A protein has these predicted regions:
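Core hydrophobic alpha-helical transmembrane segments of single-pass membrane proteins
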Residues: 2-12
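C-terminal-biased regions
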Residues: 10-62, 77-193
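Short, flexible active-site loop motifs that bind/organize anionic cofactors or intermediates
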Residues: 1-3, 47, 66
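Short helix-adjacent coil turns
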Residues: 64-76
Length: 193
């Protein structure tokens, strides 16, 4: 989906503005940009290149984005039903993710949840784990510390998280909002807070 790729590319372009000077990303290294400042840091690499994702992950992201952009949460049902397993949407078992999202949403329609999905997917991502535990996770904040964010990373955090929650998260140093995980084989594993 060109829209999702453009959304991700646009978000990546915002990250490359540093100290008031525009710095164009190098396409050969953009996928390996990292928030880790020190060599040897175990912080996962932050990635922005949609095209660097495995094809099954891209397909799942496109399906999620298309359903979310519709504004109709029921359009997410075929995406959920086509998935190999029901993605985790809460720490406790949930039979019907759509009903759960409607119940948890501000207006009962789930549109704010769909918006959160799109916001999360517009940020950078990280690849975590290895083998059967490998996962692509959005936003990268879910897997990195928040205590040493650059100004551009703080702006990206504010785009994903309501400001009052972002401030509290920065104080604690831990991300505590929506995160989305897809395995390399395209199986959507979670979208939860």
């Amino acid at each position: 989906m060109i829209g999702l790729a453009a959304l991700v590319a646009g978000a990546a372009a915002l990250v490359y503005v540093q100290n008031g000077a525009e710095k164009a990303p190098n396409p050969t290294t953009a996928a390996t940009e990292t928030v880790a400042a020190a060599a040897g840091d175990q912080t996962p690499k932050v990635l922005y290149d949609f095209n660097a994702l495995p094809d099954p992950v891209k397909r799942m992201l496109e399906q999620i984005a298309e359903a979310a952009q519709s504004g109709e949460i029921e359009k997410m049902r075929p995406v959920l039903e086509s998935n190999e397993l029901k993605p985790m949407v809460a720490t406790a078992h949930v039979d019907d993710p759509i009903a759960f999202w409607k119940k948890e949403s501000a207006d009962g329609s789930g549109r704010d949840v769909l918006a959160a999905m799109l916001d999360v997917m517009s940020s950078g991502y990280v690849r975590t784990g290895q083998g059967e535990d490998e996962m692509y996770v959005w936003p990268y904040f879910a897997e990195t510390g928040l205590s040493a964010l650059t100004p551009s990373q703080e702006v990206e955090l504010y785009r994903v998280v309501p400001p009052e929650r972002a401030v509290a998260m920065k104080r604690s140093g831990k991300y505590g909002y929506y995160r989305l995980g897809i395995a390399p084989n395209g199986v959507w594993h979670f979208f939860l807070q």
